[in-house]
Amino acid sequence: MRTLLALVLCAPTLAPALAFAEDITLENLVRAETDHMIRANIEAFGLEVGQIVHQRETVDLANQPVIRMNVDTIYSSLVLDLSEPVEITLPEIDGRYQSMHVINQEHYMFVEATPGTYRLTEEEVGTRFAAVTFRTFIDPSDPDDVKAAHVAQDGINVSGGGSGPFEAPDWDTGQLAVARKALNDLAAEISFDSARAFGRKGEVDPVHFLVGGIAGWAGLPAHGAIYLIDAVDQNDGKTPYAVTAKDVPVDAFWSVTIYNADGYMEPNDLGRNNYNNVTAEPNDDGSITIHMGGCDDGRVNCIPVTPGWSYAVRLYQPRKEILDGSWTFPEIKPVN
């Protein structure tokens, strides 16, 4: 913790503010990033306040509005104006993973993954506007599963709420970009604890909240998912790595996704940036080995890497042994 705090405090001074733009400070940095990301989603997905938009395919690598997105789920996006209450219903979908992730403008959040109707108010959520992301599991390689995932998306119902428009300060995007780069570099070097970074106000640690709010924006709270975001020692894009996992204690699923030096998925000839325990080919003993780099020889479950790459392990709906630290994900090691 002492090292992390020192590095944050010694980060480069933010760039000079643009005329008429709202200055970025350590106190408002996460708020500014959240407002920026909400605007980015509005533009990227053509959102209108109060209107849900379904993405029918996994994220387009040419249009990644947020760093470290996943390709295990398809997204449905919604921006709420909570000047009036909203009701959201999650459908019964035969056990398929689907979650509703509510993020206020301060990046405090909560998640629900149980079918039912939820009433949201400005008082409960904490800010007038909120971003809501629905994640629905999909296996893109299975046409029947794709159809079922789309039906699950269509079952989400939203009613009530104000009509906007979305309002936020005109934050200095130049300063924000400098701060984002510094904290992304920090997270890649020494990581942060997602269990202490994401949650309601009062549930998070201020340092991990600051780093996670930039390097892992829109990450799920611990009971929804645990994120292991890090970089290996030799992430030169040439040294291959691998990890083997078996009997991972989650109630939903787990995955490994690879990102470039800027935190985005990099297009590659294999068209592969991720594997999860459904899409990966298992070993004879039921374990799963995922390779990172060295894909030219056709090794199984291989994800290409680039210089400066990092990874995110996602553990969806982790069980007690993950949350209390008695079980840890296996180490990612170099491959000879």
Predicted segments with their positions:
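Gram-negative bacterial Sec-dependent N-terminal signal peptides
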Residues: 1-21
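A compositional/structural signature for long, glycine/proline-rich flexible linkers
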Residues: 20-336
